[in-house]
């Protein structure tokens, strides 16, 4: 559970960093760029710890996919960006892909033989 929380924090940090980049480019201030650098770095740190126990493909798909989905939605709400039917179709496909990747990944059951072999 702890590693899933780290992944959620990585996603939140990525979203915050990317939205800060847009905010900084619109407002012209340097604060947004500093926040962007800090949050993107934090996002990668959280992701690095999360993949210790979460399969890399699953973690990366969730990190990138949920990030893209929420960044797009927040961009529409905060920066008045357009949301076309084609973008909605793309986001829907993305969500379906994330669900398929997550549901297609099973946790490997470790046997006593594997543990004994690893200790040798």
From Swiss-Prot:
Molecular function terms from GO: amino-acid betaine transmembrane transporter activity; antiporter activity; choline transmembrane transporter activity; spermidine transmembrane transporter activity
Primary location group: membrane
PANTHER family attached to this UniProt entry: SMR FAMILY PROTON-DEPENDENT DRUG EFFLUX TRANSPORTER SUGE, SPERMIDINE EXPORT PROTEIN MDTJ
Protein topology in the membrane: Multi-pass membrane protein
TM region(s), chain numbering: 1-21, 31-51, 54-74, 81-101
Location(s) in or outside the cell: Cell inner membrane
Any GO CC annotation of this UniProt entry: plasma membrane
HAMAP family: MdtJ (MF_01598)
Protein name: Spermidine export protein MdtJ
Family membership noted in the UniProt record: Belongs to the drug/metabolite transporter (DMT) superfamily. Small multidrug resistance (SMR) (TC 2.A.7.1) family. MdtJ subfamily.
Known role: Catalyzes the excretion of spermidine.
Superkingdom as given in the UniProt entry: Bacteria
Alphabetic keyword roster: Cell inner membrane, Cell membrane, Membrane, Transmembrane, Transmembrane helix, Transport
SUPFAM superfamilies tied to this protein: Multidrug resistance efflux transporter EmrE
Subunit structure: Forms a complex with MdtI.
